[in-house]
Every structure is written in C-alpha cells, then in structure tokens.
C-alpha cells in the first residue's frame, strides 16, 4: 500500500490499465479502495472492458467484479501491487496518457439494455459478452462470465436465455459440425420472422422428426423469452411494416410476444406444404408455446401469464387445423398424419370428446352444430386466411374439431372406395357446392369405383359407405329433418334415392344384368337383403 500512496489519480488510472492488460485483475479492488473517487465503479468497469484480454478466463475476474459492484472492502493484500510501470512517469505525461486512453463505453452499441434503470454491471457484462464473442468466438466463456450474475438482473437473465442459450445449443450441442457458427450480433440483428425461419430450418432432414421438435423447444422457445426486449420489438415492428402482407393477428402481436409465436405458426403452415411428415411430427410431439426448455435459468411454467398462455395455445391449435386443411397430399400416409394432428390438437385443448371416431364395424351417426361452419366462404379455405383468429373452420372449437374430423373420416372412406381427394376439396364439396356439383362428385366416386371394380366387391358395404358419405348417418331416420341435416355429409344436397340409384347403376356396370339375374334365381345374391328403392329406380328407367 505504501507504493500506492505516492501515486496521483492519473497514475492510478494508468496502473489500473496495466493490471488489466497483464491479466492481473486481483489488485484492482485494492487499487480502488485507495482511489475510490478516481476509480469509481463505472470508470473501473470501462477500464476492464477496454484492456482486459477477451480470452481471459472469466473465473479469474468474476469474483473481483462482484466485489466491486457490491462495494465489498478489499482484504489485506498478501503482497503490494507493483507500481513500477507508472511510478516514474511525470505527472504531465501521466495526464496526457490518460487523456488518450479512449475507454470503451459501458453500453454496447445498439444495445437496448441502457433503459435508464439498467445498472452499470449489467451494461458491462452485456458489452463484455459481445466482445468475447467477436474477438474469440468462444461463447462458452460468455456463459462462464454471466453465470455468477444472471440472477441479480432481470435484463441479464432475459438476455442469457433469449440470446446466449439458443446460440450455445445451436453451435455446441445441436449442430457442432456446422462450418460456420452463428454470432451474437447476427442473432440479435434478426426480427422474429427471420429468426424463426433460420432456427427451425436448421433441422436436418432425416427419418425421424425429433430435430424439428428439439429446435422448437430448445431454440425458438428460449428466443421467444426475449420477445419483450426493446430492440427485438423495434426490429419485428419494422419488419411487419415493411412486409407486403401484414399479419392477420395484429390485434395481439403489438402487446404480447404472440407476434413471434404467430411467425412459428406461419412457418409450420408453410413448411407443411413441402415436408408434411415433419410438421405432423411436430404437432404430435410438441405442445406449443408453453412447451419450452429454458435450460433451468427460468421456470418454464411461469414464463407466460394464464390468459396469454391460453391464447397462444389456442393459436397453435389453430395452426394444426390449418395445416390439415392446407395439405394437398391425398396419400393414405398423409391422411393418417392429419388424424394425428387433429388428435394432438384436441388433446392439447381438451376437445377430445368432440373428435369423430369409429368404435365398431359401422360408421358413426354424426350430429353437431354447423351454424358457424356453414356460414364460411370459400375465402376461408385460402392459405392466407387459415390462421385468421376469426376463421370458424380453423379456430379450435367443438364445432371445428367435429367438422374436420368428420371430413377426415370421409376422406378415409373415400380412399377405401378408391377415390382420393384433399381435405380442402372435401370441405368445398360439403360447404360450397351446389346440388349439381355434389351429384357430379358423387358420380365421379362411383365411376372410379366401377372402373376398378372387382368381382368380389362387397356391394352392401359400398352402399353403406356412400350413403354415410351423403349425410354422415349409419341408418336412415324414421323422419328426416332436412334443415337439421344441412352441411352434414359430403353429398347432403343429393337425395338418398339418387345415391341408391347411382350405386345400383355402378353395380350393374360391374357385375352385369345377367349375372345379377342369375344370382337372384339361385338365391345367392349378396344384395337380396338390401332394401333398394325399386319404385324410384324404375321411375328413372334404370330397370324394366
């Protein structure tokens, strides 16, 4: 301490820079205790920021930072600080050198952490973290720097979770073999839409879909934790203003982090057009915005207020229904994937009781409220309208879940008849087609079946399936309330007699009249117990 007493304020500042440059930060606390005014906390942090090499292991100086920030008195030193580098400098020379130091500011450029309430230590740590990343690329050192401090600052904790955690997972855990690592500056420069696209597009194409789920939970989830940061809000707002098509969800995106999660829903919908299996896997294995992994730095179940969590959960469920409607693939695999999606959505939103299921050999009798569904226009099925919160087809309700699952069961039934169409096409037939169009589509189904007809075809089952497709009923009621059955079934505008007629015409085309008569005489006709509407059929001049 004796050597320090002979130093001026200028000498003390220069000595502090020397200690930092040599990595000997242990003496800074002792030096500050001798010059508390000259080496106040802000100036000392700026000296450390400017002169301490970024490659220095944080464990060597984090305890000093804590002591300086807390104002802890320096312990009695075991040995005096070496003042020889500065003690012989004339005062004028020392002052001149101090004026030329050009200390870095505590606040990182373009950083929003300086909001008037952020303490100097937090500003220092954020700036120091960026310098470590820029100069060394060792983001693990940044984690070592922040771990002792993140719990004392909400700003710092948010920054660690939303910026550093996704980068550590991306660069070191999930994709360590990538040629280029992503920097903090690059990630922080992204708006919500770009970040979601980059982080989710990292998923490697493969046989399973765990990569996408992992990225949703472990990359996008933490990123969204920082949606309230001023810089993020500014970037995302500017991106929305510059976008040709504005968000369908502007009412909520400006006041919560729903804007970012809306981009996730948009990405899933868009991605499903080219990689349906992977998106199906996401809905089957990820439970939406509340299903995130924040690395233990924050309790996941406390990140979203109740109302906001429920809203985001519903919007995610809507994205699931939208994905099903938008899927153009008519394969059996895609259809089974659609069943997976709607089942997962119904389970997540506690709407499972409204799913249409087959529990026995017969197709179920269905009846549910269609008022909101029947009022939709063709525009409701356009891709840019599927995520609109007010869309009755995709907004998750008991009606929308029942209707869509009925459509999917209809598609499965059509597939068994050899006629495959998309979910969107089925919805249009049911909701927006005239009686002529529905009849034409029915004939297409029958013709397809007849064209590929087999001798052993079970016509009784075929008839039951087509009649069920008409009105989603297993058996005809004693008295049918036409109004209550509107929009129930793909061919609800076509009369039951016409459906019966079309089935019989197809059967005759496949089996031939002579075979039918022969089997009738022999008593082996498999259709002998079917109550055909013969009078109506004769009136149509199909039989003599």
Predicted regions and their residues:
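Charged, amphipathic alpha-helical stretches
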Residues: 3-57
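Extended alpha-helical scaffold segments
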Residues: 22-26, 37, 41-42, 54-62, ...
